[in-house]
């Protein structure tokens, strides 16, 4: 009985912070339940979508922002870590703030000690280790947030993804969050169109265009992209991490979505012509 009581005590410690996304307050020690890291990864899948694309010179991050109600402001999903690094987040924003501060501190400590910018891959590895430690301790639950880390160091531009499990991967293009499969499909199709080069030869403007356009299918219902609900940021070999202004984002949306609407109209006209020919 004492052992059973201890198990239930530990289960409460595990589940209390993720109560909003857990079906019931149980832990990995109880039968017919899932590991807490699975619930953390579910939070990532339910978060608003974010996209990252990398070329030989630049990395672009774009994210869909959500508001709790019509009277609430939109939550920012892109954060600057250092001059050469920034992140896009999906999942629990409170957890993302903790990891952002940790990454900022790591970069500052490295700059103070070595008088140079921190290698992006090393920073990502440190964050992944922080993720992984939470999967082995009952005192703290896993971070319910996924990160797209964009950075540029002496080895060139980089785009990484980290997950609550502690795994991390480097990508040429990646999308996370709710309905992100639509963005992944678009990015994969555009990547394959360009053959072996992929996105490597694209300019900054072209990367921004494709990042924004890929987000079109990530919105719920009949919602449309606008400058209020979309954030875009760029970092590159000769460019510090910088957010695009609302005016710049609005212009890109008009260009990207406008072209898409024109293509749709052309396709509809072609279908009508084919119907006339059949008659």
Regions found by a protein language model. Name each.
Residues 1-279:
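Long, low-complexity N-terminal extensions
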């Amino acid at each position: 009985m004492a052992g059973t009581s201890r198990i239930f005590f530990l289960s409460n410690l595990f589940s209390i912070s993720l109560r909003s996304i857990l079906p019931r307050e149980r832990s990995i020690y109880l039968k017919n339940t899932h590991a807490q890291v699975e619930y953390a990864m579910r939070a990532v899948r339910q978060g608003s979508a974010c996209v990252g694309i990398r070329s030989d010179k630049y990395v672009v991050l774009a994210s869909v922002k959500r508001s709790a109600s019509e009277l609430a402001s939109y939550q920012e999903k892109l954060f600057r870590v250092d001059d050469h690094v920034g992140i896009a987040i999906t999942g629990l924003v409170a957890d993302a703030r903790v990891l952002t501060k940790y990454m900022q501190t790591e970069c500052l400590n490295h700059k103070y000690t070595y008088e140079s910018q921190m290698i992006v891959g090393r920073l990502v590895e440190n964050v992944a280790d922080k993720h992984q430690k939470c999967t082995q301790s009952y005192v703290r639950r896993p971070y319910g947030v996924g990160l797209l880390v964009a950075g540029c160091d002496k080895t060139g531009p980089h785009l990484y993804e980290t997950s609550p499990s502690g795994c991390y991967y480097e990508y040429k293009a990646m999308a996370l969050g709710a309905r992100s499969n639509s963005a992944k499909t678009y990015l994969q199709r555009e990547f394959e169109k360009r053959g072996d080069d992929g996105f490597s030869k694209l300019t900054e403007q072209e990367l921004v265009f494709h990042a924004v356009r890929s987000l079109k299918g990530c919105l719920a219902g009949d919602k449309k992209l606008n400058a209020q609900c979309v954030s875009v940021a760029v970092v590159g070999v000769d460019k510090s991490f910088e957010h695009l202004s609302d005016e710049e984002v609005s212009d890109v949306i008009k260009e990207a979505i406008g072209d898409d609407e024109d293509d749709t109209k052309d396709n509809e006209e072609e279908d009508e012509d084919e119907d006339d020919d059949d008659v």
